[in-house]
Amino acid sequence: MRSDIPETLQNFVSTKTVHQTWAKTFFCKPQAIFQPRTVDEIRELVDQARINGKTIMTVGSGHSPSDMTMTKEWLCNLDRFNQVLKKEEFSGPTRNGEGEEVKFVDLTVQAGCRIYELNRYLKENELAIQNLGSISDQSMAGVISTGTHGSTQYHGLVSQQVVSIEIMNSAGKLITCSSMENTQLFKAAMLSLGKIGIITHVTLRTIPKYTIKSKQEIIKFDTLLKNWDTVWLDSEFIRVWWFPYSGNCVCWRASKSSEPLSKPRDSWYGTWFGRKFYESLLWISVHICPHLTPLIEKFVFKNQYGDVETLGHGDVAVQNSVEGLNMDCLFSQFVNEWSTPLSSGQDVLIKLNDVIQTAREQNRFYVHAPIEVRCSNLTYSEKPFVDENDEPSLYPNKKWLAKRDRLSPGPIPGNNLRPYLDNSSNLRYDGDGANVTNDQLTLFINATMYRPFHTNVNSQEWYQLFEDIMTNASGRPHWAKNFIGVNGAHRTDQDLRKQLEFGGKTSYSMKGFNPILKKWFGENLVEYNKVRESMDPDNVFLSGKDWAVRNGILIDV
């Protein structure tokens, strides 16, 4: 029995005393870590926090490598609140008009359910998530709270699959929101940054299971630039890994399939030896001989992928949907990902390449590979579906569903609304997505710097130049990553000290985007803060306030 914890919370206080990021870049020792198992326990935690003047930080897997989840007060982890509660099937006419088939299945899950746990349930029930990011470790609440996305010309953020959300405010009241109900709250909750309330339940739109048939080609960097106008529109899913010192890229393109699984692709660093050897080489390049970095990249690329361009005849594999859409993130890392209109992509990559090669020639700094290049369709109609009577609905009508079969590209969305804090460039919506153009697509560029054996690498100069180029291309940072930010009055010694208190280092400290965030988000930031204040007048969920202030999230409304 802990004397510093209210009696009503004793049954679900954890024995854990430390919270740290997955990459071990930051850690904190909260006053207490709670793992509620029921809605009543979550409500009691919120009530006691309000009564005792505490703040609550809600965390899942800790994959955000910045200090955004660090706190000295109360921390809530929902890993024990992780059940699938409801399964609702929806059928529609087959494409040939001869009968009906299951088109989608809406699942209501407790928000602590990890994506890998949900994937197990889906596999058992012959279902699948429509679009995934690079990993499946996040919680259901976490995957939608920071703007997780995949890489596809048709799909948007993972939150596009969300039909409705239940969220608890600082008074302990559960509120349901969707594209039909409490829409302002819904647009805030779909990318909440944990500052709106505690998400308790999510209804997610899933579809019948599918496999992923992919073609993986080795292409030159110049080939990517030459084929820029067509490469992104060739398949439903696409991602590119760029290895700047070798001048190579891996172009992975894939579509839904019903074909049986094939033998997995060979992976040199997928073996125990290859993985440890690669990480050891990185350690040497980071701490002893930085100038070896280009040679190490070329060595690893040749062993993993070969050294022959295979455009038009790459190797083909069929995987289950999770293995196809997820990827091996390898080692502890800093990640700095930004979005920009895809139409700016060629110019951006050329400028980044110039910076990388110049820095190598001058022995100033070296970058790690791959640099991940992805795209998403973040255009939204901002309207609910309509039913057969042209009335607003949470569900697409049967006429729309009749155009699709199980392998049709693109989503059956859970909603068509843009979250207030969506960090894309707000490109123009142009129809129902049947004929996508590059002008509708947002490019994501992710600059990874590995931390071999959890040791630090100095990424500051590279990341600052990277951010300058992205900013000049109308870019914006991914909320959950290691961005640096801009100089300004918000940058104080006190804020830096707080980052260092949580285990951070000056070499990867964050300045934040306080001076320019309101310009970026305009009225959407105002609306987000209106929702935040209405949901949390007691500031129970204003944990991690330093990160929020540093980045200009909080404004007076």
Swiss-Prot record:
PROSITE patterns: FAD_PCMH, OX2_COVAL_FAD. Pathway: Cofactor biosynthesis; D-erythroascorbate biosynthesis; dehydro-D-arabinono-1,4-lactone from D-arabinose: step 2/2. Its EC number is 1.1.3.37. The modification Pros-8alpha-FAD histidine is found at H63. It comes from the Eukaryota. It is found in: Mitochondrion membrane. Signal peptide: none annotated. Its cofactor is FAD. GO terms for molecular function: D-arabinono-1,4-lactone oxidase activity; FAD binding. Keywords: FAD, Flavoprotein, Membrane, Mitochondrion, Oxidoreductase. One of its GO terms (cellular component) is mitochondrial membrane. It catalyses: D-arabinono-1,4-lactone + O2 = dehydro-D-arabinono-1,4-lactone + H2O2 + H(+). Pfam families: ALO, FAD_binding_4. Residues 26-209 form the FAD-binding PCMH-type domain. PANTHER family: D-ARABINONO-1,4-LACTONE OXIDASE (PTHR43762:SF1), L-GULONOLACTONE OXIDASE (PTHR43762). Belongs to the oxygen-dependent FAD-linked oxidoreductase family. This is D-arabinono-1,4-lactone oxidase.
